[in-house]
């Protein structure tokens, strides 16, 4: 039997500390498009007591974002106060016995980068600005982090910004969506190339979502059309990573393939997020999978068996690799539901270990009730409430197999 995953907690910079006023998402809260993030969970003020509290609760690891918009609020200006703050957070975490997996990009970006300089839409953003930032972060904090995650949920980043248009730069252009997806694959690998010279391992992030075709009638053509849609989405979301990590080729349907030296077998860990499955219909509309899965207030429908399905699919496509669940969770008022989903998720990682699949770490979203872009502060998402009182779900994390 392989050792089971080490379960920790995950949070974003915005969720734990609120959005920086230099972030490109800050305008969304000012306009009322997103709920006010204020100070998030308050972690930025309470981390000196929060981290020992989490360690005492048996939590050994934390995924946390090093906020670029705080570190570099203006182009070329490295904010010493932000550097000192992040250094202190990482130092306190290490002293408490908590390993931090540091994320470099999880959605919000500095406004000067994404808006004034067109961000990753501009070739200089990918070739010059992003590598310079990665290098500086690695040099400053590399001795204090346990692992790196260059870009969290790259498919979702491209989808929201360039197809749905719900996040900066607010585009709804299928061609731009494909180009941005390609660019984020390249940006992730460029960060891996720079970070891999240091000691902490680097994890790629595949934001997974099992998709099944759905029908509203008995027409065979409808099922065929739904199946083709599923194949198209799956090729973009999952299949592109199979070509990339196995063959060294970034293959985004509709764009020219790019073979990149060193890409095959890249990254120390194949990381992934999992937040439920989806049913996709011929007309492009979606529902949860299974259809009757209860939908949480943030619109997601956790399906714990799907986590096991996803782990096995990853193991089949990336034989011999090590894996990490970079994010899974539940935003809901009912902690008994949260405990049920957490217990089921722990069971699936244990079952994978019993089958010889190496899942080194798993991260539950989140530790302490904080801000989410979908629900603001209205719906709890932590195993601790904002008063730092533990819920039943916190005891499940403590009892998770080690």
Question: What are these model-predicted stretches?
Answer:
Residues 79-86, 341-344:
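Charged helix-capping and loop-helix junction motifs
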Residues 1-76, 83:
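N-terminal structural segment of carbohydrate-active enzymes
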Residues 1-30, 75, 87-336, 347-402:
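Active-site region of glycoside hydrolase catalytic domains
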């Amino acid at each position: 039997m392989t050792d089971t995953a080490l379960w920790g907690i995950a949070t974003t910079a915005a969720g734990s500390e609120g959005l920086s006023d230099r972030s490109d998402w800050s305008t969304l809260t000012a306009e009322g498009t997103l709920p006010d993030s204020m100070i998030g969970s308050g972690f930025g003020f309470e981390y000196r007591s929060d981290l020992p509290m989490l360690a005492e609760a048996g939590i050994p690891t934390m995924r946390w974002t090093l906020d670029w918009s705080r570190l570099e609020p203006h182009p070329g200006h490295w904010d010493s106060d932000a550097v000192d703050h992040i250094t202190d957070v990482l130092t306190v975490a290490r002293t408490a016995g908590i390993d931090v997996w540091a994320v470099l990009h999880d959605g919000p970006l500095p406004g000067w980068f994404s808006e004034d300089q067109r961000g990753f839409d501009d070739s200089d953003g990918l070739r010059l600005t992003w590598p310079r930032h990665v290098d500086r972060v690695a040099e400053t904090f590399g001795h204090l982090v346990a692992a790196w995650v260059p870009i969290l949920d790259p498919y979702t980043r491209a989808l929201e910004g360039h197809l749905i248009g719900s996040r900066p730069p607010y585009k709804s252009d299928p061609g731009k969506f494909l180009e941005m997806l390609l660019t984020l694959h390249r940006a992730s690998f460029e960060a891996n190339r720079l970070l891999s010279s240091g000691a902490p391992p680097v994890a790629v992030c595949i934001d997974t979502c099992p998709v099944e075709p759905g029908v509203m009638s008995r027409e065979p053509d409808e099922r065929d059309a739904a199946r083709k849609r599923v194949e198209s989405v799956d090729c973009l979301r999952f299949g592109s990573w199979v070509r990339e990590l196995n063959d060294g080729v970034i293959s985004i349907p509709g764009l020219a393939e790019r073979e990149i030296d060193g890409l095959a077998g890249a990254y120390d860990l194949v990381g992934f997020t999992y937040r439920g499955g989806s049913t996709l219909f011929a007309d492009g509309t979606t529902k949860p999978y299974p259809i009757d899965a209860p939908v949480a207030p943030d619109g997601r429908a956790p399906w714990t068996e799907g986590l096991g399905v996803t782990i096995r699919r990853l193991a089949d496509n990336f034989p011999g690799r090590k894996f990490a669940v970079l994010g899974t969770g539940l935003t809901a008022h009912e902690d008994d539901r949260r405990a049920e989903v957490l217990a089921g998720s722990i069971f699936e990682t244990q079952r994978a270990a019993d089958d010889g699949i190496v899942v080194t770490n798993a991260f539950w979203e989140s530790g302490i009730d904080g801000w989410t872009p979908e629900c603001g502060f209205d719906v709890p998402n932590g195993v601790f409430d904002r008063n730092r009182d533990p819920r039943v779900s916190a005891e499940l994390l403590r009892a998770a197999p080690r």
